[in-house]
């Protein structure tokens, strides 16, 4: 927000999912950075190429994805010292946190909540992969039904040792209200091992839903502290 308020060089390209090709071309950018995960951004590639505008596409879901992106961008700018600061330093922290896994392989349920629903997420997601690298077993990885149709019966049967919730959208309160409506208000919820042991955690959106970028090490450390005790 501070950057937006202080900058005089911001161009409104429209919405994230529908950027304006006309505005992009009119601004005569040297380089356009786009998301390969957003269909309408991908569709702009041919238009940009034909106009002679350089474009790079990224899909960032894991730290390794972020690392690869930063390597390319710092190669382009020549500012390799920024690579060490924003990638090398968090990478060292991540390596330290991964070593803390003690072989206990705790079982976990990872939920993503938003104002209209709640879904279980597997180890192929950003936070899911972090938990996997820290030695966790995600109960949704081997239960496709849980991913497709979150239900109390399957959760009770698996009885995970830890439950993690990430929220998306502008209102965490609305997202957590939906968790309560669909899950925590059920009397059976209180019988889960994770609840009995106070091992239910709502994770910060800025570190576990949004991409944490140079704070990725902090994300790993927060999870490791929960799982294996604060250092």
Give the label of every model feature segment.
Residues 40-43, 58-72, 105-126:
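Extracytoplasmic ligand-binding site segments that recognize negatively charged/polar headgroups
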Residues 1-3, 119-148:
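Alpha-helical, coiled-coil/dimerization segments enriched in small aliphatic residues
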Residues 22-26, 46, 50, 64-71, ...:
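Solvent-exposed, polar/charged alpha-helical surfaces in well-ordered, non-transmembrane soluble domains
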Residues 82-134:
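Basic- and aromatic-lined ligand-binding clefts that recognize polyanionic substrates
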């Amino acid at each position: 927000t501070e950057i937006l308020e202080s900058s005089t060089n911001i161009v409104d390209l429209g919405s994230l999912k529908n950027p304006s090709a006309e505005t992009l071309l009119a601004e005569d950018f040297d380089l356009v950075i786009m998301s390969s995960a957003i269909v309408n951004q991908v569709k702009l590639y041919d238009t940009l190429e034909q106009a002679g505008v350089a474009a790079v596409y990224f899909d960032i879901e894991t730290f390794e994805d972020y690392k690869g992106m930063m390597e390319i961008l710092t190669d382009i700018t020549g500012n390799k010292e920024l690579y060490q600061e924003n990638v090398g330093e968090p990478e060292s922290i991540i390596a330290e946190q991964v070593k803390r896994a003690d072989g206990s392989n705790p079982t976990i349920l990872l939920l993503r909540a938003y104002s209209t629903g709640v879904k279980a997420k597997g180890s192929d997601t950003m936070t899911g992969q972090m938990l996997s690298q820290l030695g966790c077993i995600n109960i949704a990885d081997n239960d496709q039904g849980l991913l497709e149709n979150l239900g109390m019966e399957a959760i009770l049967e698996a009885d995970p040792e830890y439950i993690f919730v990430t929220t998306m959208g502008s209102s965490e309160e609305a997202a957590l209200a939906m968790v309560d409506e669909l899950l925590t208000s059920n009397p059976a919820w209180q019988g889960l091992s994770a609840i009995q042991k106070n091992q239910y955690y709502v994770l910060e959106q800025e570190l576990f839903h949004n991409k944490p970028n140079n704070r990725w090490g902090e994300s790993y450390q927060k999870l490791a502290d929960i799982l294996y005790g604060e250092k």
